[in-house]
Amino acid sequence: WDQADPFTAERRGERLFGRGTADDKAGVITHAHALRILASLADGELPCSVTVFIEGEEEVGSPSFENFLTTHRDRLASDVIVVADSSNWKVGTPSLTTSLRGVVQVDVRLDMLDHALHSGMYGGPVLDAATAMCRLIASCHDDAGDVAVAGLVSRSQADADFPDYPEADFRADAGILDGVELSGTGDLTARLWTKPSLTLIGMDVTPLELAGNVLTPSCTARLSLRIAPGQDPAAAQEALVAHLEKHVPFGGRLTVTGREAGPAFDGSEVTPASEAAHWALSTAWDTEAVNIGQGGSIPFIATLKETFPGAQVLVTGIEDPDTRAHSENESMHLGELERIVVAEALLLARLSGAIGS
């Protein structure tokens, strides 16, 4: 971090830096200030009934969410649900997120020996578990970098109403080093939003400071599989497990434990609420709003849809390509925060009928 304490917000220019400033403290601020604006215009009264729920478990799969919804179903029932946990296409271009990938997360354990061995005395006829794990994980991608797991939903062309994403812009936004090639095939936005991706997010291996001439007997890795809209999470996990079982190196003993399985989100249907959202965003920014997808996941949206099937779900947010959510130097653009607050106030007013169409 470029500041002493990531949990103390620091303003630099038009951006506010700090852990969680954008993902997702900004969402809480958006709801609070939009309601404050509406209340101030009507002597403390809101033009419509609003329930605010701050969900603090999203990053760990929302294990308590379904039970909470069931317990408080009557209090939380809504015609429209606004989830302020996404992003805009770029600073100055407001966006409504109409597509989110789902997520499947598993722990993969590979055992090769019943105890550690001297790598000089025994290396050669036996692979250590870490090396075998690397071979197993590498089998999950083909030579082009596409996920090679059979049975996964994959769309090589993104939705027609999504904006074009020039490769040069993506490389700059992502901080890709010169000379590093992009992985995968198909439209760039499809690779980000409508095709699966697989990431090694953790691995138990011997740290360098403890390295020795040892054949490691076992190794555990954590894999995160992002799944395309239309993919059943359970079927995706089954496909991943089947692939791993098929490609175990040299007959190692494989154990796969599921950790998380969250469905994707498809909000492409045009509804009165989505039309109102486009109007509110476009008005607040004085620029036409666009539909975008997101490669990330918000699994609890599916839980909301199952619990309240008649509700229209709108996904908005404050992030932009410079936000760096989940990374050091996370930040949000303060001008964008002001505009999303105004947009949400306008949206609620339009939905309540306080502002005509």
Predicted segments, located by residue:
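Active-site metal-coordination/substrate-binding segment of hydrolases
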Residues: W1-T51, R339
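Zn-dependent metallopeptidase/amidohydrolase metal-coordination segment
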Residues: L16, R109, M133, M203, ...
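A generic structural motif
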Residues: A22, D114, L225-D232, G262
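Short beta-strand/turn micro-motifs at beta-sheet edges
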Residues: L41, P94-T98, L208-N213
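Histidine/acidic-residue-rich, glycine-tolerant segments that coordinate divalent metal ions
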Residues: P47-D128
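Acidic-enriched catalytic cores of C-N bond-cleaving enzymes acting on peptides and small amides
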Residues: W89, T98, S119-M203, Q231-R253
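Short, solvent-exposed beta-strand/turn "edge" segments of beta-rich domains on protein surfaces
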Residues: P125-V126, L210-P217
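A short beta-alpha structural unit
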Residues: R226-A228, T255-V270
